[in-house]
Amino acid sequence: MEQITKPHCGARLDRLPDCRWHSSMFAIVAFGLLVCWSNAVGGLILAQLKALGWTDNSTTATFSAITTAGMFLGALVGGIIGDKTGRRNAFILYEAIHIASMVVGAFSPNMDFLIACRFVMGVGLGALLVTLFAGFTEYMPGRNRGTWSSRVSFIGNWSYPLCSLIAMGLTPLISAEWNWRVQLLIPAILSLIATALAWRYFPESPRWLESRGRYQEAEKVMRSIEEGVIRQTGKPLPPVVIADDGKAPQAVPYSALLTGVLLKRVILGSCVLIAMNVVQYTLINWLPTIFMTQGINLKDSIVLNTMSMFGAPFGIFIAMLVMDKIPRKTMGVGLLILIAVLGYIYSLQTSMLLITLIGFFLITFVYMYVCYASAVYVPEIWPTEAKLRGSGLANAVGRISGIAAPYAVAVLLSSYGVTGVFILLGAVSIIVAIAIATIGIETKGVSVESLSIDAVANK
């Protein structure tokens, strides 16, 4: 039987010049993230259901909580399945679950049935997000992987304003009885297009195939990619610089995430995402209430909130420009310190002008960190053999903090006012900054294989 040599897919992918192939991988993943907005339409759907008498405050809380619970389970279990079945198969599977639950949910006869569908939507979405963000890093070269991942985050985060604009256009045209159903069918149809694109044009990750010892399949996919790049560029490919040791891949059991180097990365990734969830979700959900606590009326609170939130796409755009110019550890620590300091200063303001200006810059830095944490740093720190499981576990832990944070904010806002809330956010930011500085690893410009060798060898 012919001996099949290790194809060294990582080194071969990293030497590819930027071309249409990278852009096509980016476009498919970015489009998939942009249109999977079942979570983004949650508030819009609840408003319609309230008008129909389907929901009250208690049911609304259940609807929201069940979504978070589903995303928690999806992140946890989805990573396990994704590392077992592959990136392409996981992409298509989780899209199918998400689409089916949205379509079935759109025809729900009552609120209980819709809540059950909402849980499944959360499972599919939680698994899909882990797969797309983490899996995407295996296709991009180490030299500008952060820039590509930031671009994906930039496009994906337009889902919130996009679905809101669609809802604004539909509301005067469709009755409330059908409006909320259409709000679910639109992302389902668009996600079906994303699935078709993935089925037709998205190859399995050669790095994943190689990590499973499937050398022949990895070589076939890799050759197809290389031939396409040569056709697109019209130039021969640069020589391959092999960074790994040529040894056969090692199996990495789930238990390896709970010991040694991989445990340290679980702690690191969880801390990074805890800061993201606590800061981001607190500001998104509580900012209008915080404004009103400061004595600003409801109308002005909404205006201030809207103006501040323009910092979100601006922040991700800036992150996209600088991501591969600043070391990852330096960027994470720097952003968290800026958020802590600026948040405290923000809490002391009473002038509408200063609240608007400082709020804009605060949200800008927060969303630079969101891009850094969810799209770049946490997906990067895992070996290919355990990438989706590690990322999924860290995401699941991060989501727990997102569940607990609103209760802490409510207590602090009632007892200590706005300053108390921002002291909490600042404390979380500083603690995580210290964690990144002490146990963080540098991933800027580092090949996936270098990270894998270190982690797997010391698992």
From Swiss-Prot:
Keywords carried by this UniProt record: Cell inner membrane, Cell membrane, Membrane, Transmembrane, Transmembrane helix, Transport
Highest taxon of source: Bacteria
Periplasmic side: 47-60, 112, 175-181, 293-301, 351
Protein localization: Cell inner membrane
Transmembrane feature ranges: 26-46, 61-81, 91-111, 113-133, 154-174, 182-202, 272-292, 302-322, 330-350, 352-372, 400-420, 421-441
Presence of the UniProt keyword Membrane in the record: yes
UniProt topological domain (Cytoplasmic) ranges: 1-25, 82-90, 134-153, 203-271, 323-329, 373-399, 442-459
Protein name listed in UniProt: Putative metabolite transport protein YdjK
Lineage: Bacteria, Pseudomonadati, Pseudomonadota, Gammaproteobacteria, Enterobacterales
Gene: ydjK
